[in-house]
Amino acid sequence: MEQEHVMTLKEWMEWNAHKQLQKLQSTHPELHVDIPEDIPLVPEKVPLKMRMRYRCYTLCATSTRIMFWILFFLLCFSIVTLSTIISILRYQWKEAITHPGPVLSWQVTNSHVTMGGNTSSSSRRRRDIQYHKLPVEVNISGIPQGLFFAPQPKPIFHKERTLGLSQVILIDSDTITQGHIKQQKAYLVSTINEEMEQLQKTVLPFDLPIKDPLTQKEYIEKRCFQKYGHCYVIAFNGNKVWPSQDLIQDQCPLPPRFGNNLKYRNHTIWKYYIPLPFKVSSNWTRVESYGNIRIGSFKVPDEFRQNATHGIFCSDALYSNWYPRDLPSSVQQSFAQAYITKVLMKRKKQPTLRDIAFPKELSPVGSGMLFRPINPYDICNMPRAVLLLNKTYYTFSLWEGDCGYYQHNLTLHPACKNFNRTRQDHPYACRFWRNKYDSESVQCYNNDMCYYRPLYDGTENTEDWGWLAYTDSFPSPICIEEKRIWKKNYTLSSVLAECVNQAMEYGIDEVLSKLDLIFGNLTHQSADEAFIPVNNFTWPRYEKQNKQQKTSCERKKGRRQRRSVSTENLRRIQEAGLGLANAITTVAKISDLNDQKLAKGVHLLRDHVVTLMEANLDDIVSLGEGIQIEHIHNHLTSLKLLTLENRIDWRFINDSWIQEELGVSDNIMKVIRKTARCIPYNVKQTRNLNTSTAWEIYLYYEIIIPTTIYTQNWNIKNLGHLVRNAGYLSKVWIQQPFEVLNQECGTNIYLHMEECVDQDYIICEEVMELPPCGNGTGSDCPVLTKPLTDEYLEIEPLKNGSYLVLSSTTDCGIPAYVPVVITVNDTISCFDKEFKRPLKQELKVTKYAPSVPQLELRVPRLTSLIAKIKGIQIEITSSWETIKEQVARAKAELLRLDLHEGDYPEWLQLLGEATKDVWPTISNFVSGIGNFIKDTAGGIFGTAFSFLGYVKPVLLGFVIIFCIILIIKIIGWLQNTRKKDQ
């Protein structure tokens, strides 16, 4: 192919001159123009306009260059068009994320009747048997909150402590043969050896640790910390009274009024709010009802308006940063004891703390060793703490007239100086929240309709005005006044130190019982409210508990006399028990056998060596020797089997002293016997002769002492709810705070259990009673969602003959997406599975489980799509306001899903599905583009567009820079080519 020629500047000027002359002649044919063959030479100085026209010619001189320019402009046009579409779709994606979704309600119960297969009902006509199709009744019962409750047959114990005991059992054949068995001593020895050797083969010998790792002092410290670890007593050193009847604290949001949605979490100070009365009587006065309290302010509780010499509180809310709130209680205990020990006075057995425990606001020498300073917002969450501890009353007022500011002199306030309101200013800026009138009055329309016009009035429905002013959201005439209410220094005492010191002398039970009379109510209150003033506080008087130990003679009263044990046996027992003298220990998690009351019982059992053979002498005296040995054999076998199963044979152990020392009822004692464990840790033979044998069995007992027993229990199975939106299926379920529901005396108790062991009963270290989830309970439980496959089916047969069904499709009239209990009166096939009737045919609606609070849940509209794209569980909650807040916080991450995650065509398809029910036309167009890029153009084109989409914000800038560089290169290349041609 012949290469296209590009004219030089001289040639182009000659060609342009000919072109202009031809154009002139064609325009004016009456003129006669001679077109010369040669044009004069190019002048030395070519005009700029002529040079620019020549440059434009060179850029488009050949068809190849024209084709490249066309492709370049098409590429730029496609990029701009695609970027515009993506920007519009991004905005639609953002709107779809925060759009409210469906409301899920689990309170569904209905019935459905459908036709099934042939039943056994028939009629004879001649020789034919004609079957009648009978309807199969399918009973459908909804499951509230998606929680199925199944009976829990095992009681649940909240463990208080575990008692560790050790014992030696002596089995000596001489004890029986003396005076009872004369002829068959060898047979008796063989029988005893056979059983004991079998037991010895299965017992691993080990030594119990000497002494209890939890000493008496450690045990007392643990008990005291669990009860009063955060309790303190403050001596005011005088009579302290709060000076005002009301609190002007406008930095606190007000409780929602007039049906407004709750924007802020519940604040403790709201219970003291004085709202404007809706309707009053004609003779009603504010002074008679509220005293000098302003309507719209907060009331000071009456106990803080009376003389108080002391204050007591039990709360960890004021601790400074040293306190590890997120760590286990054992770590918290060690930290608290360490810091309290640092600030304790050096006086012996005094609970007084040094002033360095206070912050500087409460003591001139305070360094905040224990407590942090009280900030202005603490009055909203802990008003009782501020009223009890503060030495200064700081008002935070937006009421007209306070600090001398009124409407006419508002600009004198530093924040509103030279303030001129414009349309751009915040509507609350430099305005009073409460406007002051000339007087207050009661106005009546008739005898039954009177309303009160207060001295101060304002927009009460803007309950966050003061909070926004406190956070400097706009300039405001804030009035902050400081009123000194107390000048003397405080004296602080620790109840934990008092408990530990006095328990070492008077006993832990005596001290706890006396302290509970004073602090018992506080320990059951929340950390924000456990603050009360007290007048003339004194520490309780303790009494020593001296309980005389019964002698061995008294123990034997009313019981049959045991035969004396030989001196040789006593010596062996003393040798064997030498290492057990202090082996009252904790093998598992035993907290206390150091209680002084229990010590006597421990020694009783430890020193009371059971001679098994003697326990049966009275039963076998009247029998023949052979039968006597068989009788003994049966007892040995029973002992061996129980020991191998780690059970205690209570037939041979007197447990009355345990019940007496613990002071428990017969029912609790039955539980103790049932849950007690016996661990054999050594079996050895001390004498082995042809006619005589002796064995010693070393046993360690664990006796579990419960604090609470829960008997009527239900386990929960959390089924959740299915949601299909944006073309995808997801499962939504409430993260319940409890695992078991207990019904004692007809009352629902929701239990959360930790560190549980499933033995004969369920024994737990911690059992907490928590509020349930529901719209009316005030408990905002988290809700989780996860993506599922296109089809989901869960069928679980129940023990009563019904079926638990959760399906994404419907069949046999069974609804989709909701969990239901199905009961049929005959065999029917649903979901390709046979449902059979119960053994007892009964289809009435059965109350399978206790009732739970009503709950309606609104989820985000794109819950399923978000879960599908991310492939993770996304946390939402049961109030739509909280959902919007969480989505707003995660907006950056969610918007990043559009272009920065995955393949570009796949995202277009997902976005098309998401906008189908909101923007159908654009949805089909977007889905078509995604299908074209994925199916037609292939992976290369799709990957290229995915990359272009990823760098879209800077793509146009790079394109423009590239074009400028390309043009400069082309111009330079043309100039060099021209020089070479010349």
Curated annotation (Swiss-Prot):
Residues 1-63, 975-982 are cytoplasmic. Residues 569-591 are annotated as: Fusion peptide. The keyword Membrane applies. Pfam families: Foamy_virus_ENV. Coiled coil: none annotated. The record marks W12, W15 as: Required for Gag-Env interaction. Keywords: Cleavage on pair of basic residues, Glycoprotein, Host endoplasmic reticulum, Host membrane, Membrane, Signal-anchor, Transmembrane, Transmembrane helix, Viral envelope protein, Virion. It comes from the Viruses. The record marks R127, D128, R563, S564 as: Cleavage. The chain crosses the membrane at residues 64-86, 954-974. Envelope glycoproteins are synthesized as an inactive precursor that is processed by host furin or a furin-like protease to yield a functional hetero-oligomeric complex. A 9 kDa protein corresponding to the N-terminus of the leader peptide may arise through low efficient cleavage by host signal peptidase. The transmembrane protein and the surface protein are N-glycosylated. The surface protein (SU) attaches the virus to the host cell by binding to the cell receptor. This interaction triggers the refolding of transmembrane protein (TM) and is thought to activate its fusogenic potential by unmasking its fusion peptide. The ER retention signal plays an important role in establishing the intracellular site of budding. The mature envelope protein consists of a trimer of SU-TM heterodimers. The N-terminus of leader peptide specifically interacts with Gag protein. This specific interaction between Gag protein and Env glycoprotein may allow particle egress. This is Envelope glycoprotein gp130. The lineage of its organism: Viruses, Riboviria, Pararnavirae, Artverviricota, Revtraviricetes. The gene is env.
